[in-house]
Amino acid sequence: MGKRLLLDCTLRDGGYINDWEFGHDNMVNIFEHVVGSGVDCIEIGYLNGSSSFNPDRSMMPDTASVQTIFGQLDRKNTMVLGMIDFETCDIKNLQPCEESCLDGIRVTFKKDRLVPAMAFCREVKALGYQVFFQLASITGYSDEELLEVCRLTNDVKPYALSIVDTYGLMEPDDLEHVAGILDAGLDPDITLGFHAHNNLQLGYINTATVLALETERDVLVDGSLYGMGKSAGNAPLELVALYMNEHCGKHYEITRMQEAIVTSVMDFQRITPWGYQLTYYIAAANRVHPNYVRYLMDERTLPVTAINEILQRIPDDQKLEKNRQLIEQLYADWRKEACDDAERIVKREYET
């Protein structure tokens, strides 16, 4: 078995809850406690060229901003990473790695941007950073497309390639299938990663599934403190760490994570709760983007059976998009059909 590694993404994915406005003291506190717990990697936020520097926010315009906020902190033996959503941060915003406190950059991209994203990753790697490929919306890839991903990835030779279950749609069998293809196709020195979302409450078990893979490859899994993150949240870092201590021979200090939760996370949870919600469950059950469900539920006149019926009419190639015009048209069509059916019933009753 290869090494089993843990990455904390609280300051990045957790930012969807508070618009990345953690506050400087909380950012430092989370960093110091998570690093002190012994995690292998910590992601300190997003690099986004359209944002302006704010010491209270973990959405930063460039690596110089990262250096200002985190550069003087004791990183111990933890790999420090930032994330770029492809095409939101120009390469000129990145200093050479030797001038930065970042060890690596995770680049997330969707299938239709695969080739240009990998070209960008080459540029990032040329600056000296460890590069991580984040395959967003992994459920949108066919087996053949995953094999092509392996071919292109082997050519760039990143540190890691991660399966990203963006909408929390995967079950353990799905995950084992995808991981098996990637494990067989990737060069052996490329780490296989996994990032879960908890829409179907499977984030923890899916993460454990990846950790239990029979592979000589290194495996890296993500978690966030108290599961703080987009939609229904992520796999909770403290639970994954406990599992890894018990099953992977790790020695993470769970108490340090708990302290960070109490001092820097719970206040955000009280203001904007995350976790299991009907909206995200219905979206995941129908394999569609949550925005479609939000639109239909905001109408407040539709029974759940009607919501499911309308969602099932979304074409496969639009299920994970955010096509407002499409869902409006499907809703209008459903209403017309419902009205026509009601008129026919009334007419039939009148005639009898």
Model feature map: region roles:
Residues 1-352:
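Catalytic cores and adjacent flexible loops of soluble metabolic enzymes
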